[in-house]
Amino acid sequence: MVDFAKSLFGFGNYKKESSSQSPTPPPSAHSSQEQHHKSNTEEYPQSHLSQQQHSHRYQPPHMSEQSHQFPQQQQQQQQSGTNKFFPKTLVSAAPTTAVANHSSVYGTTSTTTNNYPEAYLNQTFKNNIYNPQQQQQQQAQQPPPEQQQSSAPYQNSANIQQPYGNQWGSSQDQDANIITIDKTGNKLSPASRDSPIKGKLKVTILEAKDIFATQPYVVCSFESSEFVTNAPDSYGKSPVSSFGHNNNQGHNGPRNMYNSNHGPSPKALPMKNSGNLFGQRPSMYQRQLSTPHLNLPNDSSNPIWNHDTIFDVVGSKSELDISVYDGARDDAFLGHVRISPSTDKNNKNESEWLQLGARITGETVSSGHIKIKWEYTSFDNNIKRSYGPDDFHFLRLLGKGTFGQVFQVRKKDTNRVYAMKILSKKVIVKKKEIAHTIGERNILVRTSAASSPFIVGLKFSFQTPSDLFLVTDFMSGGELFFHLQKEGRFNEDRSKFYTAELILALEHLHDNDIVYRDLKPENILLDANGHIALCDFGLSKADLNMDGTTNTFCGTTEYLAPEVLLDEQGYTKMVDFWSLGVLIFEMTCGWSPFHAENTQQMYKNIAFGKVRFPKDVLSPEGRSFVKGLLNRNPKHRLGATDDARELKAHPFFADIDWDLLRAKNIPPPFKPHIVSETDISNFDTEFTSENTSALKRQMEMATTPLSPGIQANFKGFTYVDDSTMDDHFARSYRANAFRPPGSFIPGDPNLPPDEEVLAEQIEEEDEMEVDEDQHMDDEFVNGRFDL
């Protein structure tokens, strides 16, 4: 026991035997682990609330006035001026995510240094286990008299810098042998081989009527992609509406479009349990609705936008969600409508008026209508379906990490805004992270195909001889960490809302045999409506069933479960629930429950320390929930019996309607302020303020291309056969060794097992040279430290 304690807390040289060259935690003495498998709790006054010191993210100067002192700890001025939930030992550390605020592929979090990669995904997609009911809009109202419309359509900004231009060629002309599977896991015939994109949906927001708003704007969501209109081009007149009510009716409050007795038109969004009276709604939503969301102005407005957008279509029965907000009144929600455009074949819907309604029974909304039109165009064999860097305009840098950078980009053919993660192959091979990098892409493909509503979707993956590219939906609300840092902490209802949506995301991953392993605020994104999306699967592991274990020592220090540090037999998916307990404690209390001045003490706190709850912050049900998640014995931890379903049944969530939550019909407690689809105000200015022209010059100064043998490590990342990559590499190398050559179409989930990749990696790694300034010291990456 003495030797073990010395080795754990830095007083000895004990190391766990492993084939990995990376630092791994020592095994535990079972007797000591049994004695400390539960978290003891203490309370102290709320005056001791504090915000932890976090290092890698910029914090505005005014934030220092909002933070509280940690008990028995003097406030210290950091060189970066940052306050984070990370220990001070990480002040000079590189960011653990490549994204200051982004999508699931945004992060570039990596695993333990020199750790041998985990197994690849050895299977294709599973059947979709999440099949929400598609709620088809059935309205057939007569349009009102035509109003004045602006002739100026929405135009893209003309002064956007474009770092890359056309210096990277395309490989679209190559006829590769492609293996493709559909959403259900069935292999497609050669005739139907293509990228995941099956067509495009053009949506035009024309105008609205009887909207009680001063600065209305519209958020359109389709398959996790978002479009935010600018301010209206003009406003029409406000005569008595042809819908049978005048504008003065709003003075007494808008009518609830979901009352069954209201009006002749059907509901735009059928609601489960919509027959419940407001008095029968769960208490959480009674509290939310007790404060009016909408203070109506005296006169209604008829905004005219004529703004259109094009969505890349992946699914066949996806919903288009249209929500209207008022930017002049703290983004007040005015109403929304959902329709399901037919995407089975070419289809066109002329303009129609849709009635705006509430998201939940009893919610106050405007009594207006919105006029839209849409057109779906299916791709045929003559349409280009191979993509590369030259198919995107690069707008802004969003984040940097160990392996690369994340950009906000605009797809040239559709003007759709995405997030693009660019990973350096040289750095990946040097750090022996090939398997985890490709594994991240595989998990994104699998989760995107299963249409999980709370996981960022992967739209494209391709590669050049020097880099890997992952293109995902852009989440304009930024990282949850950005908002947590700004506000210090959240109230219990807001924390509960985010936790509940995270439980649904983890439930989806665990049911698909995926353990996440890196849950933290930096890896949780907010969309334009305020819902969460889980991102960054660089540390995730697939093919881990309920009883399966894994041994890789990875994650972020403050969120590591004790069994990762102590159990030589490995750990299970229960590590995600431990991290969830740490996260909800941070959100509600404002600091990490296991914070310490140094890493060794933090490990000790995780293994044996007490959790101290501040007074009057968490309800008894909330404390019980956190204690259940922070049980040090994973076999007794909340969720050990029935995974996420056990968490959902906890009394803490007694007021949650999980069906409504899964359908995103519960109003989020917070709506990010968004002014346009390219708005980056919710992202860290440390990254977004960088000059993209300078980044362009850095990217153009390509390093020496990799050999064909090393390139073989990345086979399977795209939909090309083994020879295409080498042939393309050879041609591009002869043409210009310092010009990043062409790119390829999105990737194939059928990848080689890690044994093949590892063999290639070991043979070729000695041929590589990587500039030392491309990566930080290993000990400062992702909180990985020697025990």
Curated annotation (Swiss-Prot):
Domain C2 residue range list: 182-354
GO biological process: cellular response to oxidative stress; cellular response to starvation; chlamydospore formation; development of symbiont in host; filamentous growth; filamentous growth of a population of unicellular organisms; filamentous growth of a population of unicellular organisms in response to chemical stimulus; filamentous growth of a population of unicellular organisms in response to starvation
Domain Protein kinase: 392-653
GO cellular component: chromatin; fungal-type vacuole membrane; nucleus
Presence of the UniProt keyword Transferase in the record: yes
Function: Protein kinase that is part of growth control pathway which is at least partially redundant with the cAMP pathway. Plays a role in filamentous growth and virulence. Prevents hypha formation specifically under hypoxia at high CO(2) levels. Required for chlamydospore formation, distinctive morphological feature of the fungal pathogen C.albicans that can be induced to form in oxygen-limited environments and has been reported in clinical specimens.
Name assigned to this protein: Serine/threonine-protein kinase SCH9
Database matches in Pfam families: C2, Pkinase, Pkinase_C
Residue span, AGC-kinase C-terminal domain: 654-729
